[in-house]
């Protein structure tokens, strides 16, 4: 405890500022910066100080508020009945104290309905005459966000009830462990930041402005509260059973328990079972079962007096660091990973944990041979929390961060005050390998059959040095690969050829430009329509696009200023790779050739017949070999013969090769 009022005042001020910052990151940005147990410890300390020094209590203290402020672009919703937070405890002794307070207020022992504490986002569902009218988040408890359009894509939320009742239910929106792993894998492959845990993935997915994003994210719900339930429903346990009959997804693990001893057994049971559940839980919730007694006990300004959450302590194990590996990513970032003695943690065997960057490595002061404490962030991602200094070997020496790239041996650098360590050699084998693999990935150019192992062989046999080289591969080249027979060769060549027709946003994303993820590439392509305009766009023009910030804009402009990038784009275009935006549904954006039947004739000076055909097809044209009344346009080069004469006779519009190229580059909307 602080020794004086002045010391307490200073500590309270610091705690409130820190907790406000952490709460903003957690509730409003869906991006936690500390583990839950760290936040809980600081919060408990603030409560302790405010209790010891009542004069320091303040209405604007985080201990007197619910959740976070509502500052998103989603419509705002005022809750008719406030969505309160929940008090929490961290030991069975504190749970016993809660039980004693309840018994003292009621005058006798009570039964509890005990439920699993799902790690998700609070959700309200309002129904009118049995139809879903509105769905909203908790927000600050008084005002939340309208997420009705998004909730319609959550499969287990009934859009219509079997009874035409007007009511409100509340529960938790969450993401299963399987859906979370799949989402993070897709985001990682797409070059986007991964979510720290399923709770934040669920929150970020539910609070999307675009419901189509929510639809892809596989969210689920557990409903556990009925606001003003119908007459005849007298208990929490009964309310859950009746909500299940109406079609709501309720958790089957809830139980009505008569005494605290049974509650302790329940805690012990699910402490052991939590890792095997398909969703993340971070504790159990104890609720007075009798609804009338709940009403008698009432609420504080922030939490109900009739319920409490018991939070599981963070599960930690000790293990020994044997090695620190450094891997090079496609953008040149070099990442350290601790290789440890395998240890069983939270339901799986863990032997590796990312150390993210040299700054974190230095902050933790991890050394070879160190015993470290390991936990899983959000019960999913292994992390080292601290070094057990009492077990550090006597001959231990500080770990020296490498100065040379582990792949190419070039110097490693820090760019513009980044914490990341980078290799800036564009010919670095690891970067080339990662870059080509990314370009061929399902989220980018989707070249089936071109995985990491094949890419590694292509590089090892000196067949490719960059992504453009893929489009110049021949059957003879591919025959040099191990276990690659005629069928595999043909399939890969077909897949590479098909990728030429992709829309330009896939090419842009496939280039692996730092900070440019799949969504950003799509927004940029939609705005500028073709690669030429994208490459010449200024930072100001790029940041004028909604959600495109300075980081992305500066990365993009810096990339296109490089001579190597200009050469690469030229070779891709020469290979017939489409450089135009084909629209939302893969259809060509409006242009002169869209929807027209075109015939090519004569000797073409700028492109081969095949290359010109691919360009026209990418713009939505149909290219045929003969002139007829159905032909809409003839493009001719030197020494054009009978096809030009026939087109003139049928009065079919005719363009020289130069005129056609001009039309392609203009992308005008002339019909």
From Swiss-Prot:
<dbReference type="InterPro" id="IPR001679">
    <property type="entry name" value="DNA_ligase"/>
</dbReference>
<dbReference type="InterPro" id="IPR018239">
    <property type="entry name" value="DNA_ligase_AS"/>
</dbReference>
<feature type="active site" description="N6-AMP-lysine intermediate">
    <location>
        <position position="117"/>
    </location>
</feature>
<keyword id="KW-0436">Ligase</keyword>
<dbReference type="InterPro" id="IPR010994">
    <property type="entry name" value="RuvA_2-like"/>
</dbReference>
<keyword id="KW-0227">DNA damage</keyword>
<dbReference type="InterPro" id="IPR036420">
    <property type="entry name" value="BRCT_dom_sf"/>
</dbReference>
<feature type="binding site">
    <location>
        <position position="287"/>
    </location>
    <ligand>
        <name>NAD(+)</name>
    </ligand>
</feature>
<dbReference type="InterPro" id="IPR003583">
    <property type="entry name" value="Hlx-hairpin-Hlx_DNA-bd_motif"/>
</dbReference>
<keyword id="KW-0460">Magnesium</keyword>
<keyword id="KW-0862">Zinc</keyword>
<dbReference type="GO" id="GO:0006281">
    <property type="term" value="P:DNA repair"/>
</dbReference>
<feature type="binding site">
    <location>
        <position position="408"/>
    </location>
    <ligand>
        <name>Zn(2+)</name>
    </ligand>
</feature>
<dbReference type="GO" id="GO:0003911">
    <property type="term" value="F:DNA ligase (NAD+) activity"/>
</dbReference>
<dbReference type="GO" id="GO:0003677">
    <property type="term" value="F:DNA binding"/>
</dbReference>
<feature type="binding site">
    <location>
        <begin position="36"/>
        <end position="40"/>
    </location>
    <ligand>
        <name>NAD(+)</name>
    </ligand>
</feature>
<comment type="function">
    <text>DNA ligase that catalyzes the formation of phosphodiester linkages between 5'-phosphoryl and 3'-hydroxyl groups in double-stranded DNA using NAD as a coenzyme and as the energy source for the reaction. It is essential for DNA replication and repair of damaged DNA.</text>
</comment>
<dbReference type="Pfam" id="PF00533">
    <property type="entry name" value="BRCT"/>
</dbReference>
<dbReference type="GO" id="GO:0005829">
    <property type="term" value="C:cytosol"/>
</dbReference>
<feature type="binding site">
    <location>
        <position position="115"/>
    </location>
    <ligand>
        <name>NAD(+)</name>
    </ligand>
</feature>
<feature type="binding site">
    <location>
        <begin position="85"/>
        <end position="86"/>
    </location>
    <ligand>
        <name>NAD(+)</name>
    </ligand>
</feature>
<feature type="binding site">
    <location>
        <position position="172"/>
    </location>
    <ligand>
        <name>NAD(+)</name>
    </ligand>
</feature>
<feature type="binding site">
    <location>
        <position position="138"/>
    </location>
    <ligand>
        <name>NAD(+)</name>
    </ligand>
</feature>
<feature type="binding site">
    <location>
        <position position="311"/>
    </location>
    <ligand>
        <name>NAD(+)</name>
    </ligand>
</feature>
<dbReference type="InterPro" id="IPR013839">
    <property type="entry name" value="DNAligase_adenylation"/>
</dbReference>
<keyword id="KW-0235">DNA replication</keyword>
<dbReference type="InterPro" id="IPR004149">
    <property type="entry name" value="Znf_DNAligase_C4"/>
</dbReference>
<dbReference type="Pfam" id="PF12826">
    <property type="entry name" value="HHH_2"/>
</dbReference>
<dbReference type="Pfam" id="PF03119">
    <property type="entry name" value="DNA_ligase_ZBD"/>
</dbReference>
<dbReference type="InterPro" id="IPR013840">
    <property type="entry name" value="DNAligase_N"/>
</dbReference>
<dbReference type="Pfam" id="PF01653">
    <property type="entry name" value="DNA_ligase_aden"/>
</dbReference>
<protein>
    <recommendedName>
        <fullName>DNA ligase</fullName>
        <ecNumber>6.5.1.2</ecNumber>
    </recommendedName>
</protein>
<comment type="similarity">
    <text>Belongs to the NAD-dependent DNA ligase family. LigA subfamily.</text>
</comment>
<dbReference type="Pfam" id="PF03120">
    <property type="entry name" value="DNA_ligase_OB"/>
</dbReference>
<keyword id="KW-0520">NAD</keyword>
<feature type="binding site">
    <location>
        <position position="428"/>
    </location>
    <ligand>
        <name>Zn(2+)</name>
    </ligand>
</feature>
<dbReference type="GO" id="GO:0046872">
    <property type="term" value="F:metal ion binding"/>
</dbReference>
<dbReference type="InterPro" id="IPR033136">
    <property type="entry name" value="DNA_ligase_CS"/>
</dbReference>
<feature type="domain" description="BRCT">
    <location>
        <begin position="588"/>
        <end position="671"/>
    </location>
</feature>
<dbReference type="GO" id="GO:0006260">
    <property type="term" value="P:DNA replication"/>
</dbReference>
<dbReference type="InterPro" id="IPR004150">
    <property type="entry name" value="NAD_DNA_ligase_OB"/>
</dbReference>
<feature type="binding site">
    <location>
        <position position="405"/>
    </location>
    <ligand>
        <name>Zn(2+)</name>
    </ligand>
</feature>
């Amino acid at each position: 405890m602080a020794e004086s009022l002045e010391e307490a005042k200073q500590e309270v001020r610091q705690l409130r500022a820190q907790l406000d910052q952490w709460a903003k990151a957690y509730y409003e940005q869906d991006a936690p910066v500390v583990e839950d147990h760290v936040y809980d410890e600081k919060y408990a300390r603030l409560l302790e100080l405010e209790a010891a020094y009542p004069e320091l209590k303040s209405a604007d203290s985080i201990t007197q508020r619910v959740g976070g402020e509502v500052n998103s672009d989603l419509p705002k919703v005022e809750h008719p009945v406030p969505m309160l937070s929940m008090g929490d405890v961290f030991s069975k002794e504190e749970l016993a104290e809660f039980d004693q307070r309840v018994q003292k207020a009621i005058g006798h022992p009570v039964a509890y309905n005990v439920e699993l504490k799902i790690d998700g986002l609070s959700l309200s569902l309002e129904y009118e005459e049995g139809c879903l009218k509105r769905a909203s988040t908790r927000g600050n408890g008084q005002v939340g966000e309208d997420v009705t359009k998004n909730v319609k894509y959550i499969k287990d939320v009934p859009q219509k009830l079997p009874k035409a009742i007007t009511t409100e239910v509340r529960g938790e929106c969450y993401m299963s462990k399987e859906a979370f792993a799949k989402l993070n894998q897709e985001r990682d492959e797409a070059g986007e930041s991964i979510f720290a845990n399923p709770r934040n993935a669920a929150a970020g997915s539910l609070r999307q402005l675009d419901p189509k994003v929510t639809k892809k994210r596989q969210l689920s719900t557990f409903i556990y509260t009925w606001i003003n339930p119908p007459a005849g429903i007298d208990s929490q346990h009964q309310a859950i059973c009746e909500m299940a009959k109406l079609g709501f997804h309720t958790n089957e693990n809830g139980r009505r328990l008569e005494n605290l001893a049974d509650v302790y057994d329940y805690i012990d049971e699910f402490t052991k079972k939590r890792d095997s559940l398909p969703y993340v839980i971070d504790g159990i919730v104890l609720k007075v079962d009798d609804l009338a007694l709940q009403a008698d006990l009432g609420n504080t300004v922030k939490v109900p007096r009739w319920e409490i959450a018991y939070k599981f302590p963070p599960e930690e194990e000790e293990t020994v660091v044997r090695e620190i590996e450094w891997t090079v990513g496609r953008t040149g970032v070099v990442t350290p990973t601790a290789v440890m003695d395998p240890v069983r943690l939270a339901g799986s065997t863990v032997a590796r944990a990312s150390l993210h960057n040299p700054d974190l490595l230095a902050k933790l002061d991890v050394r070879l041979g160190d015993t470290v404490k390991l936990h899983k962030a959000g019960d999913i991602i292994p992390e080292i929390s601290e070094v057990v200094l009492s077990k550090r070997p006597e001959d231990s020496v500080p770990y020296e961060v490498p100065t040379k790239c582990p792949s190419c041996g070039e110097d490693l650098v820090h760019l513009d005050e980044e914490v990341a360590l980078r290799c800036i050699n564009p010919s670095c084998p690891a970067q080339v390998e990662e870059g080509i693999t990314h370009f061929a990935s399902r989220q980018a150019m989707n070249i089936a059959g071109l995985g990491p192992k094949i890419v590694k062989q292509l590089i090892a046999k000196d067949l490719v040095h960059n992504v453009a080289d893929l489009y110049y591969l021949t059957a003879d080249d591919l025959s040099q690969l191990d276990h690659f027979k005629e069928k595999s060769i043909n399939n890969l060549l077909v897949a590479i050829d098909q990728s030429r027709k992709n829309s330009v946003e896939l090419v842009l994303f496939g280039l692996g430009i730092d900070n440019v993820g799949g969504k950003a590439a799509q927004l940029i392509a939609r705005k500028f329509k073709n690669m030429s305009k994208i490459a010449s766009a200024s930072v100001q023009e790029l940041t004028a696009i909604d959600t495109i910030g300075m980081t992305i804009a500066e990365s993009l402009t810096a990339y296109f200023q490089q001579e190597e990038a200009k050469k690469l784009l030229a070779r891709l275009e020469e290979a017939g790779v489409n450089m135009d935006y084909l629209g939302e549904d893969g259809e060509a954006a409006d242009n002169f050739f869209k929807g027209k039947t075109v015939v090519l004739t004569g000797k073409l000076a700028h492109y081969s017949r095949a290359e010109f055909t691919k360009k026209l097809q990418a713009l939505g044209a149909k290219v045929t070999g003969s002139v007829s009344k159905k032909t809409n346009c003839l493009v001719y080069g030197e020494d054009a013969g009978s096809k030009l004469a026939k087109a003139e006779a049928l009065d079919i519009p005719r363009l020289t090769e130069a005129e056609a190229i001009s039309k392609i580059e203009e992308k005008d909307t002339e019909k």
